[in-house]
Amino acid sequence: HAARLDVVTDFGTINPGETKKFTFTADYPGAFFYHCGADPMMQHIARGMFGIIIVDPKNDTRPKADREYVLIQSELYPNPEDRQAMMDNKWSNVMFNGGVFKYDPVHDTNATKWLQAKPGERVRIYFVNAGPNEFSSFHPIAGIWDKVWLSGNPKNEMVGMQSFTVGPGDAAIFDLISPKEGANAIVTHSLRAALTGAIAVIMFTKDADPAMGHGEQILVR
């Protein structure tokens, strides 16, 4: 979604053992969804053939982030061959970064990772809703989004948002600051989706791991 291409010549099937390559100029800054464009597209997205492209502004006027994280929301369809279930929106779970309660030790006692920051730090979240069907009402429980940028473009700024809706195939950038120690739970406020897996806990503590939210740890594995 970050590129301006030709849907006929630049999209198509890649056969086993085949490689295709193209380049493009990123004309707009922001956070962008990318995904498999071959038919059946919905099934390929439901199988996880997607990701995020972050295009930083040339002259960044936004406040500097102290930590950065990537969260991608998607739905889990138990049978990857059941295309009708995808058409009927019959998912079993909604996930962040490919895991059910992946960063939520409250709902999954086996979870060993969560997001970390220190009180007062500006935490920037690059968020993509991969879908393929559900909207996300992206919300930080016990917090307020200090700033939100629609599609991640710095010209599309909103301030003091309790939640913000991101449709399937869309993205946004969110800044969160906690003035005190404690936890926020980042969720989609579509609660059926949240309570089946789309919750990520961010712990604000004075002894937060300095590596978290930097380098390879912007995508917590």
What is each model feature region?
Residues H1-R221:
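Copper-binding active sites and cupredoxin-like electron-transfer domains
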